[in-house]
Design a protein with these regions (language model features):
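Extended interfacial segments that mediate partner engagement and assembly in macromolecular machines
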Residues: 26, 75-144
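Cys/His-rich Zn2+-binding cysteine-cluster or related metal-binding knuckle/ribbon modules and their
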Residues: 2-8, 17, 30-92
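Alpha-helical structural signal
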Residues: 12, 27-30
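Signal for well-folded cores of large energy- and translation-related assemblies
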Residues: 16, 34, 49, 74-75, ...
Length: 199
């Protein structure tokens, strides 16, 4: 991109590093940023820096929070006897949109993926086992994506939790194989939660 100033090229390159953003989208975003007022651009930059500094993991669910417990773990209205295990925080948002699930969550921050050199020790599995071992949990719902890695992760966790007296279920397949929770509509997620099965 020799025809763009170096600072603009750098901005385009940074946007292009984001998942799902190709070269043309990165250019569009960069040009939009240039059209912002100085105050708007500063507000945008400050929001990125603030989110990076303040957003951490909930000490219980490993969901995202800006300090202390996440709102779901802090809510007395949630059923603490049921844990829904998801790959990442976007899946929490997707399931919450269904308004069907009233339990708590556990965010793994990924799935077991030998191809990507991600093993069980790279995920929030130990903290899940510790939660279940502490007692008071009746059911663990495996809500990882219905693709090869999601299935392998769910099966691994089911075996790991077998020694505990806890029911382990898997979301029903209203979600297509190879699909991702964050893209599922509310009705599909509701059916998947209602039709979960023991594994």
């Amino acid at each position: 991109m020799e025809y763009f100033p170096a600072a603009l090229e750098k901005l385009v390159e940074q946007f292009a590093r984001l998942p799902g953003i190709g070269g043309k989208s990165a250019q569009r975003l960069a040009f939009h940023v240039l059209s912002l007022t100085d105050a708007e651009a500063q507000e945008f930059a400050d929001a990125i820096v603030e989110a990076k500094k303040k957003v951490t993991c909930c000490p219980i669910s490993r969901n995202l929070t800006d300090g202390g417990l996440c709102p779901i773990c802090a809510s007395p209205k949630r059923d603490e006897r049921v844990i829904c295990v998801v790959a990442d925080a976007r899946d929490v948002a997707a399931l919450e949109r269904s308004r069907e699930y009233t339990g708590r969550y556990h965010v793994l921050h990924g799935v077991i993926s030998p191809m990507n050199h991600v093993g069980p020790d790279d995920l929030e599995i130990k903290s899940l086992v510790e939660r279940v071992a502490a007692g008071g949990i009746d059911e663990v719902i495996m809500a990882t994506n219905p693709d090869t890695e999601g299935e392998a992760t769910a099966m691994y966790l089911a075996r790991l939790l077998r020694p505990f007296s806890v029911k382990v279920t898997r979301l029903a397949y209203g979600i297509p194989v190879g699909g991702h929770l964050e893209f599922a509509d509310d009705a599909t997620l509701m059916r998947a939660l209602e039709g979960r099965r023991e594994i």
